[in-house]
Amino acid sequence: MASNNVAQFAAELKMPAGVLLEQLQAAGVQKASEDDALSETDKARLLDHLRKSHGATDGDKRKITLTRKHTSEIKQSDATGKARTIQVEVRKKRTFVKRDDVAEGADQGQAQVAEADDDAELKRREEEARREAELLEKQAQELRERQERLEREEAERRAREEAAEAERRRAEEEAATKRAAAEAAAAQQQAAAQQAAAEQEATPTQSAQDEARAAAERAAQREAAKKAEDAAREAADKARAEQEEISKRRAAAEAEARAIREMMNTPRKAVVKAVEPPKPVEPPKPAEAKGTLHKPAKPEGAQARPAVKKPAGAAAPATTQAPAGAGDRNKKPGAGKGGWQDDAAKRRGIKTRGDSSGGVDRGWRGGPKGRGRHQDSSTFQAPTEPIVREVHVPETVSVADLAHKMSIKASEVIKVMMKMGQMVTINQVLDQETAMIIVEELGHRAVAAKLDDPEALLVEGESGTDAEQLPRPPVVTVMGHVDHGKTSLLDHIRRAKVAAGEAGGITQHIGAYHVDTPRGVITFLDTPGHEAFTAMRARGAKATDIVVLVVAADDGVMPQTKEAIAHAKAGGVPIVVAINKIDKPEANPDRVKQELVAEGVVPEEYGGDSPFVPVSAKTGAGIDDLLENVLLQAEVLELKAPVEAPAKGIVIEAKLDKGKGPVATILVQSGTLNRGDIVLAGTAYGRVRAMLDENGKPTKEAGPSIPVEIQGLSEVPGAGEEVIVLPDERKAREIALFRQGKFRDVKLAKQQAAKLESMLEQMGEGEVQNLPLIIKADVQGSQEALVQSLLKLSTDEVRVQIVHSAVGGISENDVNLATASKAVIIGFNTRADAQARKLAEANGIDIRYYNIIYDAVDEVKAAMSGMLAPEKREVITGMVEVRQVFKVPKIGTVAGCMVTDGIVKRSSSVRVLRNNVVIFTGELESLKRFKDDVKEVKQGFECGMSVKNFNDVTEGDQFEVFEVTEVARTL
């Protein structure tokens, strides 16, 4: 289409509109914006301006440039003999200039300049190629000369060594000759001395002169021998020093030659730089040996095997071929003479053992997958030591993945684990510690991996929130021993009857309420006092600002009171003591104060920091003083939290409702929770579909320190989990799934590691009775408390085995699991549905319902007592004294006895005592009175008795009659 304005014309020319406006203004066409109209006249004026600015005088073309590209294929064999097809592309560029009579001189000058430029460029390239070839030839010549010089020096060294050896032999021969001459002279002197001794009397003066002359000759001979030995030693030292000097020079020359070969084999560019003389290459220093956590460092001698060196002369044939076509690689195909043929010739050069490319570097496209890139192919490098890898080990890893990280087969890992005494498969999950031991056993270095944890995003998000900190209500936890009146006290504050609604009159759930008082809002957490609810009390202390410790004035400090004090001190929370039940006649507040001082809680009147307030939950006395002290402590703490920010909190309690699904009671600690927010609590996530306050009324938002009940989570969260509001559901799902997988993998790895230990424990314990149980509770805290209480009942003979524990009603799956594991189902404040009851009756599964934790613990204890082996006890029923002994044929010995104490029964066992020492224990064979068999004989009567398998009865013996009874044991 026709371009009517500046913008369209610029789009047609494919150039920015701003640049076109500048060119139009330079041509004298005044256009202010891109939308201005553009006529054909304006375009013509712009074209004339551009032609003039680029040197054209008129519209005729003076010069034309032709570019021609030709592509062909050649077949070339590589180093392995395999034929390869290579694409060859030739590009040519020619410029034709149209000559005019008027401007012929100028055009001719321009053509000459262009030709001169082309010739200069061509000459420059040829000169560069020639210089590079000369440089490479010069380097090769220097290398050859250096090699020849080394050979000459080696020959000279050998000649010098031979001369030194000959000199040493000659010196040794001369020394031996001199020693022989000295020995002969000594023998002659000895003979002369003997002869002189005979003539001593005649010529004493002549004998002394001969002795002096002989001693001088011997000294001269010893001096000559010593000089000969010194000369031989000096010649040997000189030869050794010369040999060491030659070795050093040869090593330096070899290093220099190796450096030159490496430089010649690296890819060369067209631009030739000044070549510096190569420096001697120092041998690489061995890496510092480092030990690891599970495996110490190897000794110095075992770090590496010595490298196999190749003689320097072996690399010369391959190196001397390098200059032949070194410059052709960077030339254009048309510039050199047979560049491809020279390359092929180089590839067909002499090969070494470790070089498959013919001794020539192939450059960036030399081999498949970049093999041989920048490597020194002229020398063979044998592997010096095994490759040590740094293996990053995550928290859990399968055997196959671990083998892949070490680049070995999975069977090698399985072999190592079999040697360590563990049978595994390739899909088995290992924990981090075991995996690190295996990695170090295989000679690699193990590093604990830092996981790509999506939870790190939560920390980043927290650092970016800068909301205004505003005052918030205090969170007060009411703690104390069971039946000390915690809930009744809170009930009086709330003006509602909560304690009456709890089963058995004891609190079994953690309750959260906020109360509007004339002095401000206070949030109360009511915790159970029973010993089974330790975890609940710990959670209450964790989420609280102030602890109100309730102690009964008539009961004093009890075990759960001490535990509550420990929780408060561990959390660094201030304590306000409420001494309850002061309206009772037996109340003794002073005794309570003394007991609390012993536990480290000192009242303010004694110089401490804990207010003590006497109260009565029944009459309401002291309640106002208690609230006053609580709010005073809150003012001292200066409690603040951001309000206009995403909510954060803690799960106080959680349960599974049949109609509502997972329900969680949470305490908002900072920010504001709105209906519709995306929340993450542990492994559970979801959108807040409904939000209720503690009275069951719907609410749209909850600020800091306000407890609410939310619905819409994917599963029942764990009590005590942190609750966070996230911007989108995808992020919440990702973090929740990551936590689930991490928890599952860690649990599986720990179970696998503990299998062998548990097996050995069971083998050592022998016969242990197991009581399998399946526990279903209404809320998370009750289920947790019940499981802990029942597990504490386990003994060495009877063990409680929790097969499964969860929150919610009893379903068919629970009954099927109980059938398979032969377990008893315990429902705490839950019931079984119709299908589950029918299935339980059909399979004979025992389902027991409880709503008080005392009853559940007591009945399980009774069941465990019934599983204990009965205890056997002996009961002495009577004492018998032997008065006379009768020998009866075919029967044996019969004792005539008098029952002195108790009663004797025919079925009883008996001990025979002689002089108060037991000599036999057995059973009665017969019991007669006169000639009649009787069942029993009482005290004061006579009877005849015979003991089975015992006839050695004498007068005066005593029979102790006893019975063995079985007594049921209790825990």
Curated annotation (Swiss-Prot):
The keyword Cytoplasm applies. GO terms for cellular component: cytosol. The keyword Chaperone does not apply. PANTHER family: TR-TYPE G DOMAIN-CONTAINING PROTEIN, TRANSLATION INITIATION FACTOR IF-2-RELATED. Residues 356-369 have a biased composition (Gly residues). SUPFAM superfamilies: Initiation factor IF2/eIF5b, domain 3 (SSF52156), P-loop containing nucleoside triphosphate hydrolases (SSF52540), Putative DNA-binding domain (SSF46955), Translation proteins (SSF50447). It comes from the Bacteria. CDD domains: IF2_eIF5B, IF2_mtIF2_II, mtIF2_IVc. One of its GO terms (molecular function) is GTPase activity. Belongs to the TRAFAC class translation factor GTPase superfamily. Classic translation factor GTPase family. IF-2 subfamily. One of the essential components for the initiation of protein synthesis. Protects formylmethionyl-tRNA from spontaneous hydrolysis and promotes its binding to the 30S ribosomal subunits. Also involved in the hydrolysis of GTP during the formation of the 70S ribosomal complex. Residues 480-487 are annotated as: G1. Residues 105-114, 182-203, 304-326 have a biased composition (Low complexity). It is found in: Cytoplasm. It comes from Burkholderia orbicola (strain MC0-3). The gene is infB. This is Translation initiation factor IF-2. GTP binds at residues 480-487, 526-530, 580-583.
